[in-house]
Curated annotation (Swiss-Prot):
Protein name according to UniProt: S-adenosylmethionine:tRNA ribosyltransferase-isomerase
Function, in words: Transfers and isomerizes the ribose moiety from AdoMet to the 7-aminomethyl group of 7-deazaguanine (preQ1-tRNA) to give epoxyqueuosine (oQ-tRNA).
Organism: Chlorobium luteolum (strain DSM 273 / BCRC 81028 / 2530)
Localization per Swiss-Prot or TrEMBL: Cytoplasm
EC number in record: 2.4.99.17
Lineage: Bacteria, Pseudomonadati, Chlorobiota, Chlorobiia, Chlorobiales
Reactions it catalyzes: 7-aminomethyl-7-carbaguanosine(34) in tRNA + S-adenosyl-L-methionine = epoxyqueuosine(34) in tRNA + adenine + L-methionine + 2 H(+)
């Protein structure tokens, strides 16, 4: 299947550059796979589409401060995005600007050495004497809002580019389907008999790297660590046994659950089920665990768009996106959402 089949025109004015004034006040496009219908609602009305016995699974990862400005010896500005640790003394970063192996980059009194160019726009950095890079980012970096917002991080992003249930630090991007969720809506869902439970998946490099091949089958996904607590596994089993639905709040939850699906049945004991999700879900793939998906509107040619198309069906999703653009929905991280039933 061709990557180009998942391109579409996204006008700049349809990209939400800032969060809504009030969390949860966004719109919700509802896609019904069985009837092939598209309808319109508000995110705060999510509880009217779920029912007693359903299980809503959340990703409780917390976004870390990961965006740091540095400069070369020439004075040229370089933007660094911390992606992950590479051993104990080196880290992978996504960079914007001209950088080569051996360059030295200065920021806030520290000098990083570019050890290696790993991929297009990805480098491995170190500090002198084997010191860890993480404390420098923790002290001086900003919230890593997406580059397509075309603006620096602002105070509003510190709160709003984080979910209300963020707990375990480790992501370099938010699980954006959850940004519109509010404590009040979660309470209404629970009062209506909808169970909730959490997993942790730390969003990493794969979120930022574009697909550079023509055929989906050739694309290799980056690994992302996940942890599914034993309590969540038990809730999933109980929900399935009673005929309830597993509602994935976002593509990160979907990837973690679908990657772990074959291991869940045999997992026992008090400890979590942990792994590294490296599956690329695109049309033609089957889903073993999730029954519904709440997610955002995704960028053209992105892996998360392809995952969403795999779940909704490519033709139905294209029709839904066209309708959303016609009705001026807000797209991408700070935008509106879709519920696929």
């Amino acid at each position: 299947m061709r990557v180009a089949d998942f391109d579409y025109p996204l006008p700049e004015e349809r990209i939400a550059k800032y969060p809504p004034l009030q969390r949860g006040s966004t719109r919700l496009l509802v896609i019904c796979r069985e009837g092939g219908t598209v309808s319109h609602a508000r995110y705060r009305e999510l509880d009217t589409f779920l029912r007693k016995g359903d299980l809503l699974v959340l990703n409780n990862t917390r976004v870390v401060k990961a965006r740091l400005m540095a400069e070369k010896s020439t004075g040229a500005a370089i933007e660094l995005m911390l992606l992950e640790k590479h051993g104990q003394e080196q880290s992978l970063v996504l960079f914007r600007g001209r950088v080569k192996q051996g360059d030295r980059l200065r920021s806030h009194g520290h000098e990083f050495l570019v050890e290696e160019i790993v991929d297009h726009g990805v480098a491995r950095l170190s500090l002198p004497e084997g010191r860890s890079i993480q404390p420098v980012f923790e002290a001086h970096a900003e919230v890593p809002i997406p580059p397509y917002l075309r603006r620096p991080a602002e105070p509003v992003d510190r709160e709003r580019y984080q979910t209300v249930f963020a707990e375990h630090a480790g992501s370099v991007a938010a699980p954006t389907a959850s940004l519109n969720m509010t404590p009040e809506l979660l309470l209404r869902l629970r009062d209506g008999g909808v169970e909730t439970s959490s997993i942790t998946l730390h969003v990493g490099l794969g979120t930022f790297l574009p697909i550079r091949v023509d055929s989906m089958e050739e694309h290799v996904m980056h690994r992302e660590f996940y942890s599914i607590p034993a309590a969540t596994i038990e809730k999933i089993r109980a929900t399935k046994a009673s005929g309830g639905r597993i509602i994935a709040l976002g593509t990160t939850v979907t990837r973690a659950l679908e990657h772990a699906a074959l291991s869940l049945s045999g997992h026992s004991g008090p400890g979590p089920l942990e792994g590294e999700a490296d599956i690329f879900i695109y049309p033609g793939c089957s889903f073993r665990l999730i029954d519904a998906l709440l997610t955002n509107f995704h960028a053209p040619r992105s892996t998360v768009l392809m995952l969403t198309a795999a779940f909704a069906g490519p033709d139905l999703l294209r029709r839904a996106y066209r309708e959303a653009l016609d009705k001026e929905y807000r797209f991408l991280s700070y935008g509106d959402s879709t519920l696929i039933l």
